[in-house]
Amino acid sequence: MITVSCIGFLTGVGLNGSGFAMGVQSTSARDARVGVPRAMVSRSALCALSATEAVREATRHHRSGGNGFVIVTPTGVQVVETSAAIDDVTEERPWGAHTNHYISNKFQTVANSAAESVQRLEEAVATLGGVSDRELMERARFLVQSPGFVPRSPDRSVVTAFVMLADLGAGSVQTAPGGGERGPWVRVNLP
């Protein structure tokens, strides 16, 4: 699994000791409400005892807003999208990806979505398919450095981002700076 995130928003990104990895991005919808904050929902999903339980945690009612989750197990990937009131969960499949804009048509009535972001996601998925881990790591870092891939503040300053590659078989996570930064990949093994 590869995930790209901004430093400081890492509550639900990582490798779980129960054998799954998860990436998450906030989504924007018009049905936001008072409820459990998205960061707490994503953290609860990452701390679940299984990928199935992570899906349940991600889709619990009483959410204040939504996220796009990518939950990866050794057998496949599920994409889970939520708004405050709506959720959509894909069947397990070999590949999955998400951006901070809704992909599922189920959210058309509430989404504040941008087609350009979804198009970049589809291009990234096509680019990353069928490559070695090393090539995948370099391509992921390159994608993060691509114009328009990393979100920017209104004054157009660069947001610090990182790339994470989770290897479920080895029980490890490798991470490196993205967003124009160069640096070594650092590997962390689960105990």
What are these regions (language model features)?
Residues 45-191:
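C-terminus-biased signal that marks the final domain/tail of proteins
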Residues 39-45:
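Short amphipathic C-terminal alpha-helix that caps PH/PH-like domains
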Residues 1-38, 52, 64-66:
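A contiguous strand-loop segment
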